[in-house]
Every structure is written in C-alpha cells, then in structure tokens.
Amino acid sequence: MHKKSSTLIRKREISDVTKESKVVLKSDQQWREQLSEQEYHVCREQGTEPPFSGKLLHNKDSGEYACTCCYAPLFSSVNKYDSGCGWPSFDAPINETAVLYLDDFSHGMKRVEIRCARCDSHLGHVFPDGPKTTGERFCVNSVSLIFNKIETNE
C-alpha cells in the first residue's frame, strides 16, 4: 500500500528514484522530435487532454501502462478502475518509485501532480477520493501512457 503523509501523499525526491532506475534526460528539442504535438503538450507542458477523449479510458485488457516518453512501467491494469472522471484512473502506481509527487497550485486549486519518476513527464494528478483499497485516485491522461497488453493462453 502507498505510504501517505499528514497531507495527502509522501513526497519523493529524485535521488530516491535514481537508486533504482536511470533518469532519462533529453533536451526540449529531442522531446519535440520524439512526441506528437498532443503528447508534447500534455507530457512536457503539463497540459490536459479533454475528458472522455482518451484512447485508454475504457481499456479493460490485462497489462501494464508505461510512460509515453520513456516507456517506464507506471501502472498495472489490476489497479485500474472506472472513477467516472473522464480519464483513466488507478488506485495505486505499479510500485512506490514509479511516480513523483509535486504540489500543484495552478488554476486556483491545491492539487498533487504526478510525474514519471524516470523522465519527469506529466501524467496527471492524484486525489484523496479513491476506492477503499487505497483511498487514492490517480487520474491520468491517456496520451501520457502506452498500454502493453499481457497475452494469455486461453
């Protein structure tokens, strides 16, 4: 289970992440060449895709959700649920070091932004209104994720 602080989420430092995985650093130009306009806007400029528009919103296949920018594993289908918010929602990341948490005071609100711990890509936000399993709702832009389906032999 994810450890919580007295506010909402325990903050992680970049140094916590580098012990377990290599941080991906690219120039702005390299990101622009790699990503589509929408991917760049959401992942590198902290944009948001329109609600109910994401390609992964209704995905029910078993597998792993990875970062669009660096392919780091971020979420498991086991933790995905329909929150009704218009974006893919998860009750936890794939592991404790997969995402970074940052205070976000934009748009006159206080929220907690989530980013890929490996490449600092904007993913979305985490809220304290999730299911009973963790109490957290990781609200993630579809465009910031790549889905890797697990093939079953049925």
Curated annotation (Swiss-Prot):
Any one Gene Ontology cellular component term annotated for this protein: cytoplasm
Cofactor info, note text: Binds 1 zinc ion per subunit. The zinc ion is important for the structural integrity of the protein.
Keyword Oxidoreductase assigned: yes
Enzyme Commission no: 1.8.4.12
Taxonomic source organism: Vibrio vulnificus (strain YJ016)
Protein name in UniProt: Peptide methionine sulfoxide reductase MsrB
PROSITE patterns: MSRB (PS51790)
Biological-process GO terms, alphabetical: protein repair; response to oxidative stress
Cofactor(s) needed for function: Zn(2+)
Binding residue positions for Zn(2+): 67, 70, 116, 119
Active site: 139 (nucleophile)
Keywords, alphabetical: Metal-binding, Oxidoreductase, Zinc
Residues in MsrB domain copies: 28-150
Catalytic activity: L-methionyl-[protein] + [thioredoxin]-disulfide + H2O = L-methionyl-(R)-S-oxide-[protein] + [thioredoxin]-dithiol
Single GO term (MF): zinc ion binding
UniProt record similarity statement: Belongs to the MsrB Met sulfoxide reductase family.
Gene3D superfamilies: Peptide methionine sulfoxide reductase (2.170.150.20)
